[in-house]
Amino acid sequence: MHGNASALHTAQNAARCLDAFGAPEDIYVYPGASKPLIRPTKHDPEIHGEDGLGGVEGLNAADAPSSLTRFVLDDSGAPVRALEGMAKSIKVAIAEGHKVVVVSCGPCTNIALFVSVYPDLLKGIEQFIFMGGGVGLGNRSAVAG
C-alpha cells in the first residue's frame, strides 16, 4: 500500500503496530503497491513524518525480530506482496467453504489490482470494507478529517 508514507514504511508500521497491540503471531503483513495506478506518488512527511506515523513513540524498531516475523518471505527472501497474499488466503477460504471480508485503509490501489488480476476469486469475498480515497480535494492536510 502507499499513501501517507512509502509502501515500505506503511508495511513496517503495520508490523510494528501488530506487535505493539499483541496481535496473534499468525497475522501477517503483505506489502502492497508501491505507487498509485494513475497519478504520481506523493507522500506528506511534513504532516505524517518520514515513517508515516508522525513521531509515535513506544513501538519496536522496524527491524526488530518481532516485527520482521510478521512478513511472509518468498523463495528469494523477499516479502510476499499483497496481491499474492490475498489470492492465497482467499483460495484457502474458498477451499474450506468460507468467505473473507477484505478491510482496506488508505488508497484502494491493491483492491483495484486484485479485482483486475483475480476476478475469479471475487466469489470468495463476502464484502469489502474500506476507509480511504477521496473525491475532489481529498484529505491531504494535517487537519483533514
Model regions and ranges:
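Histidine-centered metal-binding segments
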Residues: 45-46
